[in-house]
Amino acid sequence: MELIFLSGIKRSGKDTTADYINSNFKSIKYQLAYPIKDALAIAWERKHAENPDVFTELKYEYFEGIGYDRETPLNLNKLDVIELMEETLIYLQRQYLPINGVNILSSLEGGYSYLDIKPYEALREAINNINDTWSIRRLMQALGTDVVVNLFDRMYWVKLFALNYMDYIGSDFDYYVVTDTRQVHEMETARAMGATVIHVVRSGTESTDKHITEAGLPIEEGDLVITNDGSLEELYSKIEKILR
């Protein structure tokens, strides 16, 4: 089973490439961002139940970008976001994998869970330093990078990938495709594991999003490049030439 890591900025055709591989090859598709979206969706649902006036209804699939523009502004202040992020960290800690430096306490009455003072203060400072308009996309960036990677465990999302990948070693799939490589340490892991690295590039798609996860990754010797400068059929043909 060949391990493939895809990289590309928004509107480069990276997601289209991933979908084509998943539909036309015997492959597993893995999103590094899936646990981020899952945790935010579940945390939002819980906060909506507590305070529907602030955390208005957002369907689970909206966090996947299905039927919703994830850059739509949300009417949240920084305290709202801190509360939401605390809920996501508790969910990740219990449902996925413990996060280094994140300690969770429970109240004696009612079993209410909350972050210990040290991780809470780190979270509060990080969110208070963000002055962007909040949206689902910005919440994803905040949780994935500004909070988990920068504050607690740089390799957390990579560890979750590795656990999933190990489950498929020895399977009869031909490809295991990581579809959303956005950070240097993720790509360094890919190369260390002997993965095939494919960059999908398209002229005229420079990102206006200044967050580090939307900056794009450098192309290094040995990487493959798909230049998406034509029709869908031409893109599919280029994918076929690489994988067949």
Curated annotation (Swiss-Prot):
Classification via Pfam families: DNMK
Function: Allows the synthesis of deoxyribonucleoside triphosphates necessary for the rapid viral DNA replication. Phosphorylates dGMP, dTMP and 5-hydroxymethyl-dCMP (hmdCMP) while excluding dCMP and dAMP. The phosphorylation of 5-hydroxymethyl-dCMP represents the first step in the replacement of cytosine by hydroxymethylcytosine in new viral DNA genomes.
EC number: 2.7.4.-
Keyword Lipid biosynthesis: no
Name the record gives this protein: Deoxynucleotide monophosphate kinase
Taxonomic lineage from the root: Viruses, Duplodnaviria, Heunggongvirae, Uroviricota, Caudoviricetes
Subunit structure: Homodimer.
Cofactor(s) it depends on: Mg(2+)
Organism for this UniProt entry: Escherichia phage RB69
Enzyme class: transferase
Keywords: ATP-binding, DNA replication, Kinase, Nucleotide-binding, Transferase, Viral DNA replication
Stated family: Belongs to the dNMP kinase family.
A GO molecular-function annotation: dGMP kinase activity
InterPro entries attached to this UniProt entry: DNMK, DNMP_kinase_N, P-loop_NTPase
Superkingdom field: Viruses
